[in-house]
Curated annotation (Swiss-Prot):
This is HTH-type transcriptional repressor FabR. One of its GO terms (molecular function) is DNA-binding transcription factor activity. It is found in: Cytoplasm. GO terms for cellular component: cytoplasm. Represses the transcription of fabB, involved in unsaturated fatty acid (UFA) biosynthesis. By controlling UFA production, FabR directly influences the physical properties of the membrane bilayer. Residues 10-70 form the HTH tetR-type domain. GO terms for biological process: fatty acid biosynthetic process; negative regulation of fatty acid biosynthetic process. Its main location: cytoplasm. NCBIfam families: PRK11202.1. Keywords: Cytoplasm, DNA-binding, Fatty acid biosynthesis, Fatty acid metabolism, Lipid biosynthesis, Lipid metabolism, Repressor, Transcription, Transcription regulation. The lineage of its organism: Bacteria, Pseudomonadati, Pseudomonadota, Gammaproteobacteria, Enterobacterales. The gene is fabR. Coiled coil: none annotated.
Amino acid sequence: MGVRAQQKEKTRRSLVEAAFSQLSAERSFASLSLREVAREAGIAPTSFYRHFRDVDELGLTMVDESGLMLRQLMRQARQRIAKGGSVIRTSVSTFMEFIGNNPNAFRLLLRERSGTSAAFRAAVAREIQHFIAELADYLELENHMPRAFTEAQAEAMVTIVFSAGAEALDIGVEQRRQLEERLVLQLRMISKGAYYWYRREQEKTAIIPGNVKDE
């Protein structure tokens, strides 16, 4: 990459970081202005368009980065698990670390998941589906259950984790510790329940081949 390209990428990075820094519990992405973001990044407003078509493209880039950042951290957590440790507890701890270190990135995902922009909703949904798919892959490999079971389990776990994450944004250290313990318990219940249901379906199939009743 040439010097000019490096400088352009550096400025683009500054714009993304400037936008993230201006988000807060009281301020959503929709309230940000191009001028404010450009000023925070140290460039002229007109220079913004050399890097993004408009503010929405900047926001979509931020959504993609937030999702990727979270998935990368969870991959690292699974590597730590491979060296020993509780799967669920390590994953919960890693997720809470992400929220503690990147609250605005998680706020962006939460808010735009149900925001007014169809493009933003689709982008967040896509990131969540990536997250679910990677977790389902891991569960399928570790638990040796069919894909349909691991996808259902992964979706349930991600739904609960994101809900807990929203709560974690606005509570203190001790309350967050209690939330983590509750989340670990809930995820273990889902995990045990998924395995129990799978074993039950296996037993029913063995007794009556090809005839599994949905209850």
